[in-house]
Amino acid sequence: MFEALKSRLTTPRRASRSRNDVLAECSDLARLDRLRRHARDRDTRQRADARYRALLVGGDASLRLEDRVAAVQVCTDDAVLAYVARSAREEIVRRAALDRLDSDRVLMEVALNDPIARLRRRAVAMMNDPELLQNVLHRGHPDDPRIARDAGRRLRELQV
């Protein structure tokens, strides 16, 4: 009996929560960003990336809106910015991501699909690829004819 007690005291206790549980509850964007980029374990990187993205788009109420916008404003990962521009709940977060994007393809997706007209029009105004602008011009937005007009205007601006 003494040996059993001694071994329980000298062997390290297993953490009551797994690393996955800790990541799933983590709300520290800086820590998650470091983990998703630098963790040795691929599974940890993937889980940290998923949690980071979920927090940025508003999938968890544990973060203030201002903190999410600030994190987007310093984000340098184009894939994350594209995801946030397409998926964030709040217009201000999508706009912060949109302002940092360099991808005309993502801008086109926003121009054609975002529920907020201001963001659709802003995306068109930021586009520089004539072929993709032509696509927006022809497809337009079913509820907003201004998108096609804006695309035509932007095409003319680029031709000058």
Residue ranges and their predicted role:
Residues M1-V160:
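Alpha-helical scaffold segments
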